Amino acid sequence: MAARWCFALLLALSAAAAGAGAKRTWEPVIRMPGEVVEEEVATVPRGSEGTEEEEKDGVGTRWAVLVAGSSGYGNYRHQADVCHAYQILRKGGLKEENIVVFMYDDIANNILNPRPGVIVNHPQGEDVYAGVPKDYTGDEVTAKNFYAVLLGNKTAVTGGSRKVIDSKPNDHIFIFYSDHGGPGVLGMPNLPYLYAADFMKVLQEKHASNTYAKMVIYVEACESGSIFEGLMPEDLNIYVTTASNAEESSWGTYCPGMEPSPPSEYITCLGDLYSVSWMEDSETHNLKEESIKKQYEVVKKRTSDMNSYGAGSHVMEYGDRTFKDDKLYLYQGFDPANAEVKNKLSWEGPKAAVNQRDADLLFLWRRYELLHDKSEEKLKALREISDTVMHRKLLDSSVDLVGKLLFGFGNGPSVLQAVRPSGQPLVDDWDCLKRMVRIFESHCGPLTQYGMKHMRAFANICNNGISGASMKEASIATCSSHNSGRWSSLVQGYSA
């Protein structure tokens, strides 16, 4: 039954995507890493261009932190986004030593990857994986390491290259984060998640250290606006844009069965809508002429599904907006090949996309479809789909029942789903939020990257003054009969 439900859902998603607009005209502009145009060699030798530009424009050093906060082949798009961003920054003159990359690194050589050792971020795109440094991979991709890197604290880093943002007062910093998210949290492949209040403390500490002039942050995740809503100060010299507001999904794109579709051998989405929007804009414009404000407007329009929001989200701004007229080269560098570039990228009308959480199911179903009938692998894939769908439904019903036990069967759902007015943070007591999440996970199993969407429910439990003892009692009553198995928090870990 669960598998049939999943099939119907995915069929509906594919059908909706099929009618999503006219065909894109794409003129490839991504070159293989190491493939250099002759004019670039003559004008700005690779490896020295960053220093020369910094000396000329007096902006200090450009630094970047790139984070893919997921793992697994079904999340291919997040690492593809980050690898693509790395290639853009390198072509823009940022030196490898000034770019820190976080990615689990389980995609390029994954057994499911039809092009071993290659990652692409567009249906006609070139490899974006070659040359990307393995700064922090596998178990090293953690919120703790991310904070330490941003603060330039080598002693707090565990494993990895130990590369950190050792920035100075005149330097500019660019951060790009691509992953799943939920109200108040961003995912990490190794728990715990990144919590908004913790991230704000790190940004404030970075500002207090007087080790940068300005910072720009781009975040791709569901409910990513909730990381900054009501929390992001305007006096830190930090400008932020997010793929979505505080209460909606962000969107995957270049997905199987959609238009434009990846090559037929791919069974997963190649990119995320907000992410590819800013990157395809950056690599097809002269970034000494294009401003932060202009890119925001372009990305906002494309990510909104041409202002229809049918298969799109609201790109948001937070923080200090006084320097939106700054040119993008101050943060992303400048590629001489784009000095006289005209916009090579043409996209007319709405394009197909799938929300981040359904993209995971889409991958599982496409994998199932391609396996040989009656094979053990196909049966195993079907069981995984059924297990995943049933666990999602169990999570949803468990959170719902906890709310009903705490607030009454009539009021529970509305209390858990309540959205605070714009300008207010998700929760007043972030430590309470973490406690409530741990109590729930101790008795009902981990939230998983899907269950992150329920963070608002736990925040509202805190906002309504529920005690830890009452939360524990409700969680036990709800989940005492559950057989968690591989979904147990003892196996998966705790997200708080």
From Swiss-Prot:
Q: Which GO terms describe its biological process?
A: proteolysis involved in protein catabolic process; vacuolar protein processing
Instruction: Summarize induction of expression.
Output: Down-regulated by treatment with gibberellin (GA3) (at protein level). Induced by hydrogen peroxide.
Q: In which tissues is it expressed?
A: Expressed in germinating seeds.
One short Pfam name that applies is: Peptidase_C13
Its EC top class is hydrolase
Which cysteines does the record link by disulfide bonds?
C255-C269, C432-C462, C444-C479
Q: Which residues form the active site?
A: H180, C222
The record ties this protein, via InterPro entries, to: AE (IPR043577), Legum_prodom (IPR048501), Legumain_prodom_sf (IPR046427), Peptidase_C13 (IPR001096)
Q: Which UniProt keywords apply?
A: Disulfide bond, Glycoprotein, Hydrolase, Protease, Signal, Thiol protease
Which residues does the propeptide include?
23-57
Name recorded for this polypeptide = Asparaginyl endopeptidase Rep2
Q: Which organism is it from?
A: Oryza sativa subsp. japonica
The gene designation is REP2
